[in-house]
């Protein structure tokens, strides 16, 4: 594609050294820039792509997207107000607007995005339709397919648009269900994506290191709904504190549907019961009721299933097909995943106050009489520190014993993170509270402090198979560690 064609619809401030050159790719890493790329000079918290522009040109960049003119560089420069926001427009144009030919469904929320995307993919497949999935675990082209790695919940714009084009043209798939993070909305990584539907799971505290306030966090999430157009659909959790605010930003002509357990909604769950086998409830619609039996547990699973069912209704998929699909699902990797039965050991991705509270309440529902609920958890470094004491308080209130350990400490001192967590405890009773900074050792302790009728929750990392330390990233998988510790137990 020629540069003049690439920027035909782009709002730019100036053109420097402009000429018609062929653009054969998009790059924002000077080290991997190839001949014919347009190099995007991204400005971040710690690095400025403008400083690497010459290296990109030396590696073959045919043009630059810049926020300020760069002297002594002879290739064409397109100056814009924000390269971080305009990279999405460039990528969308370069890959010929792939989302326009897709039924693209976006799921946003603090917790539950991954599970809901998987559930909707299953519903499409039960309806004899192909559906690709993009999210935290990577992307995959079918529910039985292999994940391809992802560095972010929502990929960067060039990778995202390239993936959408591949899904449409190469794999011949028309439906895509996609996790949409607040960061990707705020940074416009999903700019250019034309969503046909948007789903809200919930909005609770997370990422305040980035958004600073809950109002800013809400505004970022709301962007997904504000961009919907006539004949699209919006699915909102009616029980969420921010439900009315989300409903208010949905444009006229967009079909609005709600789901919930407590507040009146279009789709509701009543008579909810939990057992070791899973959750069961009565699904209540405006004109019908259905008995639902799940192989997944916890109130959060009920909400996730309601979100998927409501979305299928919005897409005019037969409710019986949706229910058949959901009742055959056994969960998602690292989400309330059972890795041992006696004691019952559950690995979950819960890494927010709300997420931890939900998983512990759900675990309590299935803790046998006389059994203890034990929780191992930590908090990530270089992230919202205000949630640390809150998570400590929640764990102490809901579990009988807690083991405080490291999560992904990153550049922070693990002991300081633990100190922040302990600040939320009412007391530090050594019979009920154990501190072990080494996560592997913390999980190993479970063998000596648990009995067969106990329930153990290892929270925070879920599907992750790595741990990010100050100077390195190591292989670490909570599920592997737990299986080693309880080898020889009933699994």
Question: What residue ranges belong to the model's regions?
Answer:
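Acidic, Mg2+-coordinating active-site environments of NTP-dependent enzymes
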Residues: 70-74, 171-174, 186, 195-345, ...
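Phosphate-binding loop of NTP-binding sites
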Residues: 7-10, 87-238, 242-254, 306, ...
């Amino acid at each position: 594609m020629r540069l003049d064609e690439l920027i035909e619809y782009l709002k730019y401030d100036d053109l420097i050294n402009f000429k018609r050159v062929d653009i054969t790719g998009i790059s924002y890493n000077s080290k991997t820039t190839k001949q014919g790329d347009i190099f995007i000079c991204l400005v971040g918290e710690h690095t400025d792509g403008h400083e690497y522009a010459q290296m990109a040109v030396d590696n073959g960049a045919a043009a630059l997207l810049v926020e300020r003119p760069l002297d002594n560089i002879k290739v064409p420069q397109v100056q814009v107000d924000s390269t971080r926001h305009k990279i999405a427009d460039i990528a969308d144009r370069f890959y010929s607007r792939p989302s326009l030919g897709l039924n693209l469904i976006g799921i946003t929320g603090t917790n539950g995005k991954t599970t809901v995307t998987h559930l909707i993919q299953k519903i499409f497949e039960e309806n004899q339709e192909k559906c690709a999935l993009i999210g935290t675990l990577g992307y995959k082209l079918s529910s039985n397919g292999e994940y391809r790695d992802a560095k972010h919940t929502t990929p960067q714009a060039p990778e995202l648009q390239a993936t959408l084009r591949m899904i449409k043209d190469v794999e011949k798939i028309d439906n895509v269900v996609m996790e949409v993070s607040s960061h990707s909305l705020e940074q416009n990584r999903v700019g250019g994506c034309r969503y046909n539907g948007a789903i809200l799971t919930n909005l609770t505290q997370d990422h305040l290191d980035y958004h600073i306030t809950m109002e800013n966090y809400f505004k970022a999430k709301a962007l997904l709904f504000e961009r919907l157009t006539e004949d699209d659909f919006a699915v909102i959790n009616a029980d969420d504190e921010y439900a009315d605010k989300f409903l208010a930003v949905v444009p006229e002509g967009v079909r609005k549907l709600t789901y919930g357990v407590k507040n009146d909604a279009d789709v509701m769950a009543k008579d909810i019961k939990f057992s070791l086998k899973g959750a069961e409830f009565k699904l209540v619609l405006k004109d019908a009721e259905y008995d639902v039996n799940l192989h997944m547990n916890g109130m959060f699973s009920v909400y996730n299933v309601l979100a998927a069912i409501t979305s299928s209704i919005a897409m005019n998929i037969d409710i019986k097909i949706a229910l058949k699909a959901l009742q055959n699902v056994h969960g998602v990797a690292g989400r309330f995943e059972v890795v041992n039965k006696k004691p019952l050991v559950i690995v979950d991705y819960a890494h927010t106050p709300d997420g931890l509270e939900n998983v512990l309440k759900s675990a309590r529902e299935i803790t046998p009489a006389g059994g203890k609920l034990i929780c191992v958890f930590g908090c990530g470094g270089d992230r919202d520190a205000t949630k640390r004491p809150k998570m400590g308080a929640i764990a102490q209130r809901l579990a009988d014993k807690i083991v405080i350990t490291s999560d992904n400490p990153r550049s922070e001192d693990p002991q300081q993170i633990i100190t922040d967590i302990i600040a939320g405890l009412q007391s530090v009773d050594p019979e009920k509270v154990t501190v072990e900074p080494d996560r592997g050792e913390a999980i190993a302790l479970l063998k000596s402090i648990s009995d067969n009728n106990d329930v153990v929750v290892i929270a925070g990392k879920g599907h992750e198979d790595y741990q990010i330390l100050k100077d390195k990233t190591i292989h670490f998988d909570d599920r592997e560690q737990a299986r080693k510790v309880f080898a020889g137990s009933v699994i």
